[in-house]
């Protein structure tokens, strides 16, 4: 399996890039979706969160009132730590399970917004960073109903463009049209296929050399063995 860590600042257009890659055959694992799934109604994760923070955080349909929980944990680092202690192991386990569904020759794309912030660069074969001009990102976020001041605050709490570039193997400029993006992702996809094949070849070569080395060692031991007297 070949793994790609996909990241970028809020409003950069990671979802559009993910869709383009998925259309070409990548298996997409969305970190935000996994985080929601592990505390879905009826899950052990939701039960653990409600036991820790109170059953009043359950909404009318039995799900988690994420806004109410957010108000608690964002104002209290200790509470945030308790929440992370519950959900992070579940997220890692579920992510690993989904990764395990990828075929040995497949390409898995893990969309993880805070990849650089949690220093996960070394976890993937390739880190792909999506960029877009700041004002365009703000325009996109305002179009989603996020006020400009809140959008700026969220940007300020994320890694900088230069920090993300430093971690990147591939950078995608998503400041143009969807057609521009699709053309760029086709280039990226061919690059990923080539990197995947190179990894597979290197692995096969290393395995063959290990087998050959073991055979040579065994033969050498046989040649130098003292004859029975």
Curated annotation (Swiss-Prot):
Protein name stated in the entry: Dephospho-CoA kinase
Organismal lineage: Bacteria, Bacillati, Actinomycetota, Actinomycetes, Frankiales
Pathway: Cofactor biosynthesis; coenzyme A biosynthesis; CoA from (R)-pantothenate: step 5/5
Organism: Frankia casuarinae (strain DSM 45818 / CECT 9043 / HFP020203 / CcI3)
InterPro entries: Depp_CoAkinase, P-loop_NTPase
Catalytic activity: 3'-dephospho-CoA + ATP = ADP + CoA + H(+)
Disordered, as annotated region: 203-229
Transmembrane residue ranges: none
Any one Pfam family match given in the protein's UniProt record, by short name: CoaE
The protein's Enzyme Commission number: 2.7.1.24
PANTHER family linked: BIFUNCTIONAL COENZYME A SYNTHASE-RELATED (PTHR10695:SF46), DEPHOSPHO-COA KINASE-RELATED (PTHR10695)
Gene: coaE
Annotated NCBIfam families: dephospho-CoA kinase (TIGR00152), PRK03333.1 (NF002879)
Keywords attached to this entry: ATP-binding, Coenzyme A biosynthesis, Cytoplasm, Kinase, Nucleotide-binding, Transferase
